[in-house]
Amino acid sequence: MEFTKVVAERYSCKNFSTRKVEAEKLTEILEAGRLAPTAKNSQEQRIYVLQSEESLAKLDKVTPCRYGAPTCLVVAFDKNSVFTYPGGKRDSGMEDAAIVATHLMLAAANAGVDSCWLNFFDPDELAKELGLPENEEVLMILDLGYAAELSLIHISEPTRPEPIS
């Protein structure tokens, strides 16, 4: 799909069917995350694929926002591998993970897979529930799947400024 069309047509799906994301599409989505740029090419991102009933139940304990998605990606980063910016006040972890997550989300749209970016959860609680190492910090969850047939797709009117001239 043409990039501006992907960006314009992507929306946050909040009612998923039980249809599974095909393995080849999931691989394509994950590859986009792997190829995402990171500061100094540190590649500190960690992407956890949750698909089993057990892992999705753990997710459901910490957020009401899975919306029935059959696949969820948890995007985290290794705090020990981040690039620290001059002055030592900030590091690349959160922004690199956000770049990776954005690549995943747009690759999903390009593959015809619906998604929803989730931040409504306690990252420490989720890390504990999933048994993640202490050096990893969770940024977000990306719900993946296909919209339920009867779901109402709400596409908001753009609130962005007029196009740049």
Task: Indicate where each model-derived feature is located.
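Glycine/small-residue-rich phosphate/adenosyl-binding loop
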Residues: 25-31, 35-100
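Acidic, metal-associated active-site segment
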Residues: 100-109
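Short beta-strand segments at enzyme active-site cores
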Residues: 115-119
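C-terminal helix-cap and adjacent tail motif
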Residues: 3-20, 25, 141-156
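Structured binding elements
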Residues: 112
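Short, electropositive alpha-helical surface patch
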Residues: 126-139
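Short secondary-structure boundary segments
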Residues: 77, 120, 146
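Single conserved hydrophobic/aromatic residue that forms the stacking wall/gate
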Residues: 153-165
